[in-house]
Amino acid sequence: MQNLRITSTASYHPPLNITNQQLSTIMDTSDEWIKTRTGIHQRYISNIENTSDLALNVGNQLLTNANLKTTELDLIIIATMSPDAYTPSTAAIVQGELGAKNAIAFDISAACTGFIYAMNTAELMLKSSNWQNAMVIGAEVLSKLIDWKDRSTAVLFGDGAGGVLLQKTTTATPLILGRDLHTFGDLGDKIVAGKTTPKAGFPKQLTSLSPFAMAGRDVYRFATHEVPRSIASAVQQANLKLDDIDYFLLHQANERIINQIAKRLGQPITKFPMNISEYGNTGAASEPILLTQAVAHELVKPGNIIAMSGFGGGLSTGTIILNY
């Protein structure tokens, strides 16, 4: 019986890191203010690399790690809310740069939940076809959407990319044991980035993009209530108990949010690895970056049961229970 396996993980961040102290020189904030409210100490910021550049770096790593030819790729999905352009998609750019001529490629825009949605989409497409290999990447250059004078958002975000290679293998155990996906469109105005408004009259003027804006307190309440519910639902669908989960790999938005989610689930914080202090919030890239690090440090091992969960713009939540 054929099921899917994650055969390669990879991540990449730009070389430039910006500390809280550096931010305090350009806005009214301090290292202590940022750390106590978010857990963030620094973040990586792209200088000239765009979203496709970060994703391409990850894609090349994934292929090298798995010893796979680019022509053997069947599917490339990139989760991002900071694409290079409206069109072509970031995934199409990466497909062209890789020379993966046999792969179809498209983006998924579901903000910080995007990687979870992309994993579900890739799994369903592989299982319903004769395709063998899929590349799923979360990549963001959020720094280009930030108002660097607004401390309520500028201190939170960083740039980076992470991804996995999914391949069909002969195994009796599915990769995704349970899932829970929800969209809360009535709360869409709580997180907004890149909004465009048509100009009146004709001929039209080019519209400008609005910077990132977030209702922080509302998002905190949403995350601390809806993410535990999503995780519990996915665990139940997998016919497991919360205690059966080896690690919970959550979207790295805020250390206080993660601590509260662990408390609500009644699980020890040691089962919730974090890298937010180094990376900040990297949007759809946060979950695969965290997974890559957990695998590299031999925290997550083959046979582990892990819950990957994200939340973000939409508003949206998504959880998958993986038999790693």
UniProtKB/Swiss-Prot annotation:
CDD domains: KAS_III. The keyword Cytoplasm applies. Its main location: cytoplasm. It comes from the Bacteria. Disulfide bonds: none annotated. The active site is at C112, H251, N281. Its EC number is 2.3.1.180. One of its GO terms (molecular function) is 3-oxoacyl-[acyl-carrier-protein] synthase activity. GO terms for biological process: fatty acid biosynthetic process. Pathway: Lipid metabolism; fatty acid biosynthesis. InterPro entries: ACP_syn_III_C, ACP_syn_III_N, FabH, Thiolase-like. It catalyses: malonyl-[ACP] + acetyl-CoA + H(+) = 3-oxobutanoyl-[ACP] + CO2 + CoA. Residues 252-256 are annotated as: ACP-binding. Keywords: Acyltransferase, Cytoplasm, Fatty acid biosynthesis, Fatty acid metabolism, Lipid biosynthesis, Lipid metabolism, Multifunctional enzyme, Transferase. Gene3D superfamilies: 3.40.47.10. HAMAP family: FabH. The last Arg residue of the ACP-binding site is essential for the weak association between ACP/AcpP and FabH. Catalyzes the condensation reaction of fatty acid synthesis by the addition to an acyl acceptor of two carbons from malonyl-ACP. Catalyzes the first condensation reaction which initiates fatty acid synthesis and may therefore play a role in governing the total rate of fatty acid production. Possesses both acetoacetyl-ACP synthase and acetyl transacylase activities. Its substrate specificity determines the biosynthesis of branched-chain and/or straight-chain of fatty acids. Belongs to the thiolase-like superfamily. FabH family. Homodimer. This is Beta-ketoacyl-[acyl-carrier-protein] synthase III. It comes from Limosilactobacillus reuteri (strain DSM 20016). The lineage of its organism: Bacteria, Bacillati, Bacillota, Bacilli, Lactobacillales.
